[in-house]
């Protein structure tokens, strides 16, 4: 699966994620956005929520994405980014 297919799937499922989980914004970053993924690469997704969510909803969203994409997903909240790595991630993220 390539970057464009991942973006298409996320875009198609975004309305459901907005209503179910309070997702405000999703973005792809890491090896898939650079198109340098390997067979064992996970899909790195940056998320912003429009409401407070608990750990169970966060983990449920990750499982939801993994089941739709059929790959392991590394889900990262934009609000939890550390300054050093956050700058790099924000410079490469492609929002869906």
Predicted regions: what they are:
Residues 46-48:
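Short hydrophobic/aromatic beta-strand micro-patches
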Residues 28:
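Conserved histidines in hydrophobic membrane contexts and catalytic metal-binding motifs
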Residues 1-25, 33-39, 50-96:
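Catalytic core of pol beta-like nucleotidyltransferases
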């Amino acid at each position: 699966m390539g970057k464009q297919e991942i973006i298409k799937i996320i875009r198609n499922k975004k309305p459901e994620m907005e209503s179910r989980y309070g997702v405000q914004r999703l973005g792809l970053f890491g090896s898939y956005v650079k198109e340098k993924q390997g067979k064992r690469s996970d899909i790195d997704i940056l998320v912003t929520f429009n409401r407070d969510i608990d750990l169970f909803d966060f983990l449920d969203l990750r499982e939801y994405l993994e089941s739709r994409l059929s790959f392991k997903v590394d889900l990262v909240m934009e609000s939890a980014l550390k300054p050093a790595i956050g700058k790099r991630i924000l410079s490469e993220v492609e929002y869906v």
